[in-house]
Structure formats: C-alpha cells, structure tokens
C-alpha cells in the first residue's frame, strides 16, 4: 500500500484508481504470498503443452511448482524460469530405487543433475501418499530405503546443500487428531512412520503433507461445519489449551506437528504439498466453496497456525482441471480450465498480473498497490 501523499486528479488516474479498487475487491489476493506454489498435474488429454504451461506460471508470477514425475518436457520448459520445483519420484519407481544405489545415481543424474542449475529443484518427493493403511501398502518397506538412496545420490552429485529429500503423506497416517495437541501417528503405522521421521530429522528436511479439509468435511458434514472447513467460522470452534482454532486446516496441520513431536521429530518442519477444493463433482464441491477456500487458504498461508506461526509453504492442487482423473470430483480441482482460462480471480505476487475469470486484464499488482 503506497504511503505517498501526492494526489493526481486527472481522469486517467481516476480511472486507474477505480480499476484498482475493483481488482482489490474481486481478486483472490496473493500479493506477497511467496509461500504459495501450484501443483502441475498432467492427467488430461486436452492440456496445454509444457512450454505454454510454464509460460502461464511465469505470466501469473507463480514462483513454485510441484511436478509429480520427472517429465523431461516439463523440465526442459522450466529451464531458466527461476521457478522453484518440488520434483516427484513416482510410486512406480520407489521399489527400483530402493534396490540399489546404482539406480538412485542413475535417476539423479538423468532427472536432477542434467537439469541443474537451470531448473531450481528444491525438493525430491520420493513417493506420494504411500501408507500401510491404503492400497499402496506393498511399497511401505521400500520407501525409507529409497529416500536414503536418493539422499546419498544427491550428496554424491554435490547438491546436498541445495536439495532436500522427503516424501509426501496424507492424513490417513494420523491416528488421533483431536484435539490437535494430542495428534499422533497411528499405532499400527509407527513401524513405517518412525524411520521416516528419523530420516527427516537427521537430514533436516521437512515432511510433505497433503491436507484437504474438503474430504474431512464431505465425509462427515454432521460433525464438521462448512464454515470451519472454509476458514469462515465467526468464532472459535476448538479450544485446545491456550490455542484457539477457527479453521480445520490449522487443526489438521497442528495435529501432524504434534505427531512429529511424539515421534522424536520436534525439529521437523512441514510443507503442505497439496491442498485444494473441487468446484464440482460431489457433495460440497461448488464454485463458490472452492473460491472461498482458495482465497482464504492463500491469505492464511502468510500467517501460520496456532502451534507454528509464520508463513506456511503451501502448494495448491492443481493448476488445471484434469479430465482423465477419477472419480468425477478429481476432475475439478484446477485453478485453470485446459484452455488456460482462469476459473477464479487471483493475484499471484506483487509483480504479477491480476487476472479475472471472465475477462483477462493487463492491470498489474503494482497498480493495485498504489491504492
């Protein structure tokens, strides 16, 4: 917000002022929210090519990107973009990487070192939502060995000070989440989670966590209110000692922090590797709910949770609606339609453009900052 006392009473400046006010009123404001990234999924048959996608990230000033596998077309397009990348090692490769260092070295050479430093890889996410209580249980015994091998290979490549190795988990691993201070990993999964926590603690890497208040709400609307899920509850919903919770996102996040502490990982940070809200396809999945959740999530990421105040590095799921995903609601998480038209009104950063879901505009966030 400009502190200048100068007044410019020309018609042109009046029009600019009016435009800026309208943009401030209508946009999901991410000005200064450097902790926000967006996940780039590719499960659609009508998506833009990689170069167009990365140009879209750049033109919207989206400075962080999650990539679910080392797609070389996307990595080529990312060269020189200055976008920070969370690079996924897919579940299908975990067992192979765990089986020997030679495989980890090859993977790091082909997918990391060959693109470094032109591509700013920040994290390697080894596996996504591998868990002993889901359909990925067959991979659980291979996950930590795969993480260790990739970590060693990254170190051998001379990138140990630049790239952190972790894994992305979901909330199925949390056995107790209420109240948040009593959060703990499932007793029947501790054999799986404890080695992961120890690895992250020892390597000073964060745990990557996919947090979706939508699924908690839609699965139990009688107990979890929509306002609590959308960051719009007018009053405190959960009083946990001295900590007050007005939204489900914070409660979920802090329950994982508590679980980490109970597992010897008090020093382990958290990156929210996915969060979003579908705009169609199931109960509670509406355009208005999705817009409200995204607006408030983006704002809240600047602030932190009751347990851990401060910016929360958060990746919105996802960049596009992806028509090859199932079930139906999974097709409707995108910030953009496949034709690159925005679904919502969002402003990514002080140097990026404000964009409108009905009409594209060349107005910049610096213009808005003059109001």
UniProtKB/Swiss-Prot annotation:
The active site is at 129 (proton donor), 274 (nucleophile). GO terms for molecular function: glucan endo-1,3-beta-D-glucosidase activity. The keyword Lipid metabolism does not apply. Is expressed primarily in epidermal cell of healthy plant, and following induction by ethylene, accumulates in mesophyll cells. Its main location: other. Residues 1-33 form the signal peptide. It catalyses: Hydrolysis of (1->3)-beta-D-glucosidic linkages in (1->3)-beta-D-glucans. One of its GO terms (biological process) is carbohydrate metabolic process. PANTHER family: GLUCAN ENDO-1,3-BETA-GLUCOSIDASE BG1-RELATED-RELATED (PTHR32227). This is Glucan endo-1,3-beta-glucosidase, basic vacuolar isoform. It comes from Nicotiana tabacum (Common tobacco).
């Amino acid at each position: 917000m400009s502190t200048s006392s100068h007044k410019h009473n020309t018609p042109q400046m009046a029009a600019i002022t009016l435009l800026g006010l309208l943009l401030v009123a209508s946009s999901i404001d991410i000005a200064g929210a450097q902790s926000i990234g967006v996940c780039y999924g590719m499960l659609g048959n009508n998506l833009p090519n990689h170069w167009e996608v990365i140009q879209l990230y750049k033109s919207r000033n989206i400075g962080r990107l999650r990539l679910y596998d080392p797609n070389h077309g996307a990595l080529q397009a990312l060269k020189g973009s200055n976008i920070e990348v969370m690079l996924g090692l897919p579940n299908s490769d975990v067992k192979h990487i765990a089986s020997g260092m030679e495989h980890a070295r090859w993977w790091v050479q082909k997918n990391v070192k060959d693109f470094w430093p032109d591509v700013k890889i920040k994290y390697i996410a080894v596996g996504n939502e591998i868990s002993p209580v889901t359909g990925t249980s067959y991979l659980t015994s291979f996950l930590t060995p795969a993480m260790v091998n990739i970590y060693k290979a990254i170190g051998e490549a001379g990138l140990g000070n630049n790239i952190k190795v972790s894994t992305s988990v979901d909330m199925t691993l949390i056995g107790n989440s209420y109240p948040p201070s009593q959060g703990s990993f499932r007793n029947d999964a501790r054999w799986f989670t404890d080695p992961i926590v120890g690895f992250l603690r020892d390597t000073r890497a964060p745990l990557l966590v996919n947090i979706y208040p939508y699924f908690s709400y839609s699965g139990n609307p009688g107990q979890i209110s929509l306002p609590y899920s959308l960051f719009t509850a007018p009053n405190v919903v959960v009083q946990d000692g001295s900590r007050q919770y007005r939204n489900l996102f914070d409660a979920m996040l802090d329950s994982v922090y508590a679980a980490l502490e109970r597992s010897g990982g008090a020093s382990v940070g958290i990156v929210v590797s996915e969060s979003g809200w579908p705009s169609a396809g199931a109960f509670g999945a509406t355009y208005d709910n999705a817009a409200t959740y995204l607006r408030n999530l983006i704002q809240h990421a600047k602030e932190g949770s009751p347990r851990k105040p401060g910016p929360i590095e958060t990746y919105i799921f996802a960049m596009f609606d992806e028509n090859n995903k199932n079930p139906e609601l999974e097709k409707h998480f995108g910030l953009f339609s496949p034709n690159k038209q925005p679904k919502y009104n969002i402003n990514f950063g002080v140097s990026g453009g404000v964009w409108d879901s009905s009409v594209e505009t060349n107005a910049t966030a610096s213009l808005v900052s003059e109001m």
